[in-house]
Swiss-Prot record:
It catalyses: a lipid X + a UDP-2-N,3-O-bis[(3R)-3-hydroxyacyl]-alpha-D-glucosamine = a lipid A disaccharide + UDP + H(+). Belongs to the LpxB family. This is Lipid-A-disaccharide synthase. SUPFAM superfamilies: UDP-Glycosyltransferase/glycogen phosphorylase. InterPro entries: Glyco_trans_19. Its EC number is 2.4.1.182. One of its GO terms (biological process) is lipid A biosynthetic process. It is an enzyme of class 2 (transferase). Keywords: Glycosyltransferase, Lipid A biosynthesis, Lipid biosynthesis, Lipid metabolism, Transferase. GO terms for cellular component: membrane. It comes from the Bacteria. One of its GO terms (molecular function) is lipid-A-disaccharide synthase activity.
Length: 389
């Protein structure tokens, strides 16, 4: 009796909620490209697990923000990487896909690639924002890079790294014209009148650093415009509990806190005050005027500054190549500064029309059927590996 061929094995690691979204999109695409019975396993979050992914370790173990803040978690994170490397070298997968989390994944991809395991990395790290030493690390670790932004492929190919532009799955998921009224009805918000969405982050460290400033800014805006309403999504029950002391210390705010549904909350809004991150791209795809802010501990900020970061940190500005929305960062992010800038974004109709044009063009560029494009590249990498003598 002929032996049955072994099933394909796709190992994958995602270390952030945004990576969980990207990886789940890729898993959906791979399901239609690879044979039934293909095994998908590694480190992932709830969206990946919902597709049938076998998470050997929970993604939350890797979700640590900032240089200084990560120090106390380094032993556990390195232990997880060492154990996963041991497992993958003992039973090599058909391909390894690292999704974002470059500090963790490059250290895993390098020895896997040296052992002959094909490596694909989904989401190019910010080589265009930081000094270029990282690109040498990429060249040693990665067989093929999946890029979510169009300008990244040329930078990588110049350094000898195979790369494909696959677009961003958020651009496929979000409609070109947002349904603001429908979102308000779905959330039970007022159908008339101005609404500002406020997103201070999803980690305790973020809430501790910028939460009080955001709440003080809300209070100032409401004082200036009593008709204003605010909506704030809480991604988890734990985050809602983190926000409770801030809510209690600012009684009388016209603030609705939703259970998750961040995209719906932003869709319902006329303007957004948001902590920097992938969510700023989501806000741009929803065609919303916004103010981007963040605060990190002083030492982390100094390290970032010395690394040569771009003059802008928000993805809408990075993609546009100029400041199209304001960024108010670190000690400049006072309640008054945030309140004034956000109200200006809310009131300026000419700016709103200009941003809608800019963000619509951006949406078309990023809308590339990412799941299928990325899956095609991963499948081709597997085929090349199988064709080796």
């Amino acid at each position: 009796m002929a032996l049955q061929p072994s099933p394909l094995r796709v190992a994958m690691v995602a270390g952030e909620p945004s990576g969980d979204l990207l990886a789940a999109s890729l898993l959906d695409g791979l399901a239609s490209r690879l044979p039934a019975g293909t095994q998908y396993y590694g480190i992932g979050g709830p969206r990946m697990i919902a597709t049938g992914f076998d998470a050997h370790f929970p993604m939350e173990k890797l979700t640590v923000r900032g240089y200084v803040e990560a120090l106390k978690h380094i032993p556990e994170i390195l232990g997880i990487r060492t154990e996963l490397k041991r497992q993958l070298l003992a039973e090599p997968p058909s391909v390894f896909v690292g999704v974002d989390a470059p500090d963790f994944n490059f250290g895993l991809e390098h020895p896997l690639r040296d052992a002959g395991i094909p490596t694909v990395h989904f989401v190019c790290p910010s080589i265009w924002a930081w000094r270029g030493g990282r690109i040498k690390k990429i060249a040693k670790a990665v067989d093929h890079m999946l890029c979510v932004f169009p300008f990244e492929t040329a930078l990588l190919e110049k350094a000898g790294v195979a790369a494909s532009y696959v677009g961003h799955p958020l651009a496929d998921e979000i409609p070109l014209v947002p349904d603001t009224l429908g979102a308000r009805r779905a959330l039970g918000l007022a159908e008339e009148g101005p609404i500002i969405a406020v997103l201070p982050g999803s980690r305790r460290s973020e809430i501790d650093l910028i939460g009080p400033t955001f709440f003080a800014a809300i209070e100032m805006m409401q004082h200036q415009e009593p008709a204003l309403r605010f909506v704030m999504p809480a991604a988890t029950p734990a985050l809602r509990e983190m926000l409770r002391p801030l809510v209690d210390s600012h009684p009388g705010l016209a603030l609705t806190i939703t259970d998750g549904q961040s995209q719906l909350a932003m869709t319902a809004a006329d303007a957004i005050l948001v902590k920097s991150g992938t969510v700023t791209l989501e806000a741009a795809l929803l065609k919303k005027p916004m103010v981007i802010s963040y605060k990190v501990p002083w030492l982390t900020g100094q390290i970032m500054r010395r690394q040569g970061y771009l003059p802008y940190v928000g993805l809408p500005n990075i993609l546009a190549g100029r400041f199209v929305v304001p960024e108010i960062l670190q000690h400049f992010a006072t309640p008054q500064a945030l309140a004034e800038a956000t109200l200006k974004q809310l009131r300026d109709e000419n700016n709103r029309r200009t941003l809608t044009e800019i963000f619509t063009e951006m949406h078309h560029v990023l809308k590339q059927n990412t799941a299928q494009r990325a899956a095609e590249v991963v499948a081709s990498v597997i085929e090349k590996r199988k064709a080796r003598p």
